[in-house]
Regions:
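C-terminal catalytic/acceptor-binding lobe
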Residues: 154-225
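Glycine-rich, basic loop-to-helix element that forms the pyrophosphate-binding segment
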Residues: 67-84
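Short, well-formed alpha-helical segments that are part of the catalytic scaffolds
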Residues: 21-35
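Short beta-strand-to-loop acidic/aromatic patch adjacent to the donor-nucleotide binding site
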Residues: 87-98
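Short beta-strand-to-loop element that shapes/binds the nucleotide-sugar donor at the catalytic cleft/hinge
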Residues: 117-129
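Acidic donor-binding segment of Leloir-type glycosyltransferases
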Residues: 34-66
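Aromatic-glycine-rich donor-binding/catalytic loop that engages nucleotide-sugar donors
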Residues: 133-150, 159-170
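Conserved donor-nucleotide/metal-binding helix-loop-beta segment in metal-dependent transferases, i.e.
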Residues: 102-120
Length: 225
């Protein structure tokens, strides 16, 4: 697919992220956008209706999607992709990360729309994966059975390998300051981590590359709200 253009400048088709409590970090991320973006899609998992983000100057369209109860990280990321189905690629990023100067321009220049693209980022490349349309076409979306977070990336990497999707390393850099040391996070994650790890190991043992999908029982059992 041809690059999106405004004048003679290419556009990043979609930047998307989910947020839940730290709107200050979400605003830091938005403030780091230094290259034209067509659609900025935010899924607000907080259920509080207390935050109204302002559209950054370099963004054409801001979409702030509020839900009464959280979709989890990959439920939100799947929604971002499904709601912008004509994009050649999607830049999905954790809300506790932010773009280094020039990162978005580098992404637009180097991205492979047939691959899963990674940038240089602290902690884990999965804090800012860039999904090409070819990757999504061949491997599908995240399995929302892994609610609300963790082992979703392990499962997706296993599935894209099985589907023959290439992983490409870009030279762009994104900064990341994980919030995983928060006490409330640690307490909630201690329970759901085990459930998701067991689910992942069962899929491996059964040679299962399918997408189990969202489940009402899993959502309620793994609740953080």
């Amino acid at each position: 697919m041809e690059a999106l253009l405004v004048g003679e400048i290419s556009l990043i088709p979609v930047v998307g992220f989910a947020t839940i409590t730290r709107f200050d970090l979400a605003e830091r991320l938005m403030g780091s956008i230094d290259y034209p973006v067509d659609h900025l899609v935010i899924v607000n998992n907080s259920g509080t209706q207390t935050w109204q983000p302002e559209k950054p100057k370099l963004v054409n369209h801001l979409w702030h999607l509020e839900v009464p109860f959280g979709l989890g990280l990959v439920g939100a990321w799947n929604l971002i992709i499904k709601s912008t189905p004509y994009a050649p690629y999607w830049v999905l990023v954790n809300d506790d990360a932010w773009f280094a100067s020039g990162a978005l321009e580098t992404i637009e220049r180097e991205v492979d729309t047939e691959a899963l693209n990674f940038v240089h980022i602290e902690q884990t490349p999965w804090a800012a994966p860039i999904f090409g349309e070819g990757c999504v076409r061949r491997a599908g979306l995240y399995d929302e059975a892994f609610y609300p977070i963790y082992f979703d990336d392990n499962d997706y990497e296993r599935r894209i390998t099985n589907a023959g999707v290439e992983i490409k390393q870009l030279s762009a850099r994104i900064h990341h300051e994980p919030m995983t040391t928060r006490q409330n996070f640690l307490q909630q994650n201690a329970r759901t981590w085990v459930a998701n790890e067991n689910r992942y190991r069962r899929k491996i043992a059964e040679d299962d590359y399918s997408v189990h999908g969202w489940s009402l029982d899993v959502r309620r059992e793994n609740r953080w709200d």
